[in-house]
Amino acid sequence: MGTSARRALWLLLALCWALRESGATATGRKTKCEASQFQCTNGRCITQLWKCDGDEDCVDGSDEKNCVKKTCAESDFVCNNGQCIPNRWQCDGDPDCEDGSDESPEQCHMRTCRINEISCGARSTQCIPVSWRCDGESDCDSGEDEENCGNVTCSSDEFTCSSGRCISRNFVCNGQDDCSDGSDELDCAPPTCGAHEFQCSTSSCIPISWVCDDDADCSDQSDESLEQCGRQPVIHTKCPASEIQCGSGECIHKKWRCDGDPDCKDGSDEVNCPSRTCRPDQFECEDGSCIHGSRQCNGIRDCVDGSDEVNCKNVNQCLGPGKFKCRSGECIDISKVCNQEQDCRDWSDEPLKECHVNECLVNNGGCSHICKDSVIGYECDCAAGFELIDRKTCGDIDECQNPGICSQICINLKGGYKCECSRGYQMDLATGVCKAVGKEPSLIFTNRRDIRKIGLERKEYIQLVEQLRNTVALDADIAAQKLFWADVSQKAIFSASIDDKVGRHVKMIDNVYNPAAIAVDWVYKTIYWTDAASRTISVATLDGAKRKFLFNSDLREPASIAVDPLSGFVYWSDWGEPAKIEKAGMNGFDRRPLVTVDIQWPNGITLDLIKSRLYWLDSKLHMLSSVDLNGQDRRIVLKSLEFLAHPLALTIFEDRVYWIDGENEAVYGANKFTGSELATLVNNLNDAQDIIVYHELVQPSGKNWCEEDMENGGCEYLCLPAPQINEHSPKYTCSCPNGYHLEENGRECQSTATTVTYSETKDTNTTEISPTSGLVPGEINVTTAVSEVSVPPKGTSAAWAILPLLLLAMAAVGGYLMWRNWQHKNMKSMNFDNPVYLKTTEEDLSIDIGRHSASVGHTYPAISVVSTDDDLA
């Protein structure tokens, strides 16, 4: 074979190899799939979970070849088609088998309801909890659970409204419409007060001792009026330099003055304001506020009233299946494409090789699911539950990434998802909501001078605690059936048993200067609170015997607070400048910011422990928002100037969020995912400040690690839960009172006595500074006479090492001077005054032995003759 023939043969082999490689690449055979994927014979990558699952996901079916016959576990239900599903999914009203065999009448007609459940009828396979019967909400598909319920009968200490609603008899003829139909205020005699009471202009009664005490107790402030007291009430609040004081006494940021949005209770921040005009680059909302011009018609409501999104026209007219956009920019109707006429300037509507060619006929156009042919070209589409991941290949949609897709638990399935409920809840098949099983949940809220409760199902409305002064914060230990609240006028935290008669309560914690919010740790039995006056966050045992500052720095206007003892974290809001929401360990460690942008007045926060999210109210932005517990996935639930005029506090239960609005003096409720289904639960309130849901499922049980091995975790003072950052995190740590610190054993406390040492010429003095604050009644007894030397800073040990050498040097110098003195006494000396060095002999020699001096050693004099009399004196 000649050289030219061999060369041609090599070229032919190289060409064949290149064609083989290009073919392999074209079919995707050389495409490398990820470790969690399976590679089809045709090169496509699918998730390993889809291999041998009974569905052909590879177009060539290679994912279902050589599969071992699948057997279901004992805890599974076997569908007629061989599919396996959990047993609990059988006969739950939701078909989970592809053939629907798990919900077939043959399978489900023999189903018997469990204890504490009732059947929805002879022809129904549905069971619901007994507590859902006659609760005012249809839970059976047939509505049978709300039939033959009869009229609600109120108890002897309740009043029956015309609507059938039950309210406390204390609410009758109190000057407020508590029935919401006015029937509790009909035929009322003129109100009278007792001999030791004062009657407000609103007819309500308060103790006579509360009159003219510079604290308005009447809702109309008539007890502190000029006519009653002969003087204006003294306002004790002193606002910082960055804030201004409202006529009603509270402080707000200076920048909120004359911004078009009333922030003071009396609206005094918007009085005598100059007329506002927007800049040329701004858009003026209908309410007069200004936003940047670029925010108009951006698809987001930036104006509170939404006027920036009114009358917006779609700029892009080529959206939708009936439009075609030319490459030259024109937009034409799809019917004009491939009609053999020039409708685009560049003829892009008439490509000869592409018109009326059905690409879907060849290999389904390369689409993994659905191929849709069009006049020019084609497009791939996916079946329900799938989405395009590379314009041709369909992948499963993880619907569970949407927090509101399921009420509680979401399980992602191939092409779909399954919703389930947490323990203690059961799904209402009519609504898909996970509803609590057991006692009726209720809302408990403060109303300044009393604490009230309203049932969320039967709407029973009663008074729990009365004759209070100025209640601002509220929480509960539900397992112990105890309420806790803070009274800003009495500067204390109180408690009462929820089953006790109205009026019986005990002072637990005193000297709380200006409590803003409280949060009860129901597992470790402690209470946390924010204090706006001292700018601190504190923690104490529920009996108030032990307490301490958890944080007393970097706080400006601490407001709401919430705890999660199951994970060991505490969360709080701060509306100071800059406003923020923070989180930290409940032991005071691992402090970090959670929300720092687009936040101005975060008044109330609450935790959704089931969905692991934090919700908060912004009174300045009139907004209800949420984030996950790491500060990610932020969502706006509701933005409303009407229902969020001045929101103060909120709470969450099931799929609903409830909040108090101070300006509207009402309690509202809405869907926690969408903000829809708005409803008014209570109105005509009097300075309501805080609200909670009362139900055993609100506070899930957890292990108190401080009582697991030894009492109080072996701690001398407080035992606090540690943040569970990872599996190696400690369960708890010991903590000491203010002015004390933990010893090396991590359990015992010792006084933090600071030793300050300073030096002077010829002398050294030590001053001991003892702690001056932090000890409270009930704290540990540590004798202050025992001083402590704190751990020396780096380098101090070296100074102690050379101290003996310095003492030896001083002794040598002293001996030398004594010898010189003896020598001078035995010889004559002459002293010549040098006109140049006019210094006295007292300045001739200076020996500085101070530890902190810049120069250590001798300073030699300018005169050679030295007198030692002064040195030895």
Curated annotation (Swiss-Prot):
Residues on Cytoplasmic side: 820-873
Domain EGF-like: 356-395, 396-435, 702-750
GO molecular function terms attached to this record: apolipoprotein binding; calcium ion binding; calcium-dependent protein binding; hormone binding; reelin receptor activity; very-low-density lipoprotein particle binding; very-low-density lipoprotein particle receptor activity
Residue spans crossing the bilayer: 798-819
Pfam family for this entry, one: FXa_inhibition
Membrane topology designation: Single-pass type I membrane protein
Post-translational modification: Ubiquitinated at Lys-839 by MYLIP leading to degradation.
Disulfide pattern: C33-C45, C40-C58, C52-C67, C72-C84, C79-C97, C91-C108, C113-C127, C120-C140, C134-C149, C154-C166, C161-C179, C173-C188, C193-C205, C200-C218, C212-C229, C239-C251, C246-C264, C258-C273, C278-C290, C285-C303, C297-C312, C318-C331, C326-C344, C338-C355, C360-C371, C367-C380, C382-C394, C400-C410, C406-C419, C421-C434, C706-C719, C715-C734, C736-C749
Major localization class: membrane
Chain span(s) of sequence motif Endocytosis signal: 832-837
Highest taxon, organism lineage: Eukaryota
Known tissue expression: Abundant in heart, muscle, and adipose tissue.
Cited function: Multifunctional cell surface receptor that binds VLDL and transports it into cells by endocytosis and therefore plays an important role in energy metabolism. Also binds to a wide range of other molecules including Reelin/RELN or apolipoprotein E/APOE-containing ligands as well as clusterin/CLU. In the off-state of the pathway, forms homooligomers or heterooligomers with LRP8. Upon binding to ligands, homooligomers are rearranged to higher order receptor clusters that transmit the extracellular RELN signal to intracellular signaling processes by binding to DAB1.
Cross-link entry Glycyl lysine isopeptide (Lys-Gly) (interchain with G-Cter in ubiquitin), positions: K839
Subcellular location: Membrane; Membrane, Clathrin-coated pit
Taxonomic lineage: Eukaryota, Metazoa, Chordata, Craniata, Vertebrata
Name of the protein described by the UniProt record: Very low-density lipoprotein receptor
Keywords on record: Cholesterol metabolism, Coated pit, Disulfide bond, EGF-like domain, Endocytosis, Glycoprotein, Isopeptide bond, Lipid metabolism, Lipid transport, Membrane, Receptor, Repeat, Signal, Steroid metabolism, Sterol metabolism, Transmembrane, Transmembrane helix, Transport, Ubl conjugation, VLDL
Residue intervals on the Extracellular side: 28-797
BP terms from Gene Ontology: cholesterol metabolic process; dendrite morphogenesis; glycoprotein transport; lipid transport; positive regulation of dendrite development; receptor-mediated endocytosis; regulation of synapse assembly; ventral spinal cord development
Spans of repeat LDL-receptor class B: 439-480, 481-524, 525-567, 568-611, 612-654, 655-697
A GO CC term attached to the entry: very-low-density lipoprotein particle
Subunit structure, interactors included: Homooligomer. Binds to the extracellular matrix protein Reelin/RELN. Interacts with LRP8. Interacts with LDLRAP1. Interacts with SNX17. Interacts with DAB1. Interacts with PCSK9. Interacts with PAFAH1B3 and PAFAH1B2, the catalytic complex of (PAF-AH (I)) heterotetrameric enzyme; these interactions may modulate the Reelin pathway. Interacts with STX5; this interaction mediates VLDLR translocation from the endoplasmic reticulum to the plasma membrane. Interacts with CLU.
Signal sequence residues: 1-27
Stretches for region Clustered O-linked oligosaccharides: 751-790
Keyword match Transferase: no
